[in-house]
């Protein structure tokens, strides 16, 4: 086993990869207006444009349950490098959006095949669908990094040594997601939005170099890859998420997608009974502690994404701030997440694991409730206090959830457990953003019906302009207040599965 200082240094490129991959979850929040303008996407198509975020989360979460197990079979180091390479490839694709004008030179080529191919690629690369598709490719690579990292930590550390690195893993993922909007705002102040993705390339290559030289090769576990099981799990996750995207919009379609997803899950259950080495062992869900940790992570992810999306939107609209100001406001919460994660790791190592969980949920629920009381005149110190409290609360939850899940399985299932506990959070985020976009759009339209002023012609409201703006601001405030209340309620519900988390750390090689 490596000495402790070398192991800590070796994790630097691993954590850096997670941070920058997570950054791309939300970087689109602040550059979306530029993307829509560049690709001539109308404001009325905002629900479609939101798939630049939802699609990333969908790709991210779909591979998480299986990549931990894949790294068991093919090796942690190889899978991490391969995943980062896929992330870089997807970044190149997104960066090339609206930038393939050179293909016009092939429009006069003698070969009709080359002419048609060049024309097709040029046309599709200037569409929103291209951005969504290349973002999904990015996400497939990024989604593997967290479960593989947790498996690397489990291989490298023993017992109580794992708590803090696991907390930092989650903190890097959360901090990257929250830094994303700020990063996007800064880059687009000086360059085109495509540079957000061009910059992923040198960063990704540096991470790969660090992994090559610092991470040792682990001994893969012998076994065959369950390809059919992998496809079924990915299909189930995608269908359920697509169903949630119809929430409040198309109930029959919602029921169809969710039902189909559940059918796939049932099919996987019976398939796993016939496999000696299933990609996701069903038996691990028979452990109430593992199941509780995943349910809690689901609520955690949904509440977190509501907070991440609502804060910058509220700043940019009813508070009349810029994209950069929205990112800077969110940064106040980011600062507290790693602090809470380290504190949660220490509390989990020293006391009952559930203590950090209870405190985190209470802090989050309380701070989100306070945010639901924000008005257009909210300012410091109240705003900063609420944001710091929320970030600290989200951070406190990382270590106890992860440690409880990893503590409840044997060494043979650690890779699969790492993949599933990572996936549950991002599945919550994917379901949360999909449902939020659909329900929020419908709610906004319903609230607009309550405005007395005639707004049938956008930009030319009858009556007094200031009265119209005031009522529109109140509509926005009501909508955002509802979002924060939903997030707070999800945290309170999370107290129920928190009761079942592992009560105390085990004195063993697991945790």
Segments the model singles out, each with a brief description of its role:
Residues 54-68, 146, 150, 331-344:
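Central cavity-lining transmembrane alpha-helices of secondary-active solute carriers
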Residues 9-16, 23, 29-30, 53, ...:
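12-transmembrane solute porter fold
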